């Protein structure tokens, strides 16, 4: 099975070091299954791109490799001139996975979930500054969830939860935002607006 990169909007040139560069990337799981084989592509900084493919084509595996969640068997990843480890350390990447592993019964408010996106920028004590709270509000507003900020995450529909996690990624202010199946469970009106 294959997947393709669809360039939707490009702003920079492909020769810049400020690209997402994947060269000959192969990911083989411990059970011997190769989920991604020899993937290579460049996406210029400032571009909007879509990874398109059928179920099982390796899209989620690629995102997990870009995030450093799973090791590659072979190949190289450069994110805006940084290794995956350094890009993560410098808060350059925000990620919304296909599905969140969350205890929906845990009593956490929507605004606190989005505030988690600021943890990398808030410093050691993780105290929210007024500018962090303003970014949280702006992110919730962008996804149409500001009116739900004081609701518990477990009270929301699947599409609303997805929008909250998108707001968390926006609050991170990463240079790269990876969205795995971003519109699963989201209504058509919301999908059209974002």
Task: Please describe what each predicted stretch is.
Residues 128, 152-156, 160:
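Conserved ABC ATPase signature
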Residues 115, 130-148:
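Conserved ABC ATPase "signature" region
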Residues 6-38, 43-47, 125-126:
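A short, flexible loop at the N-terminus of ABC-type nucleotide-binding domains that lies
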């Amino acid at each position: 099975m294959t997947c393709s990169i669809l360039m939707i909007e490009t702003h920079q040139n492909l020769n810049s070091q400020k690209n997402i560069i994947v060269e000959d990337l192969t990911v083989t799981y411990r059970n011997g299954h190769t989920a991604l084989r020899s993937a290579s592509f460049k996406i210029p900084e400032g571009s909007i791109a879509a990874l398109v493919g059928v179920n099982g084509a390796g899209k989620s595996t690629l995102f997990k490799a870009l995030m450093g969640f799973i090791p590659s068997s072979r190949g190289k990843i450069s994110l805006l001139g940084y290794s995956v480890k350094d890009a993560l350390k410098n808060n350059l990447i925000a990620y919304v996975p296909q599905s969140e592993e969350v205890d929906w019964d845990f009593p956490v408010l929507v605004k606190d979930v989005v505030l988690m996106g600021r943890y990398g920028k808030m410093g050691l004590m993780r105290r929210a500054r007024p500018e962090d709270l303003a970014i949280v509000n702006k992110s919730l507003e962008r996804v149409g969830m500001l009116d739900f900020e004081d609701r518990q995450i477990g009270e929301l529909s699947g599409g609303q939860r997805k929008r909250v996690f998108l707001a968390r990624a926006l609050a991170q202010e990463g240079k790269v935002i990876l969205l795995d199946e971003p519109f699963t469970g989201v209504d058509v009106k919301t999908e059209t607006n974002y």
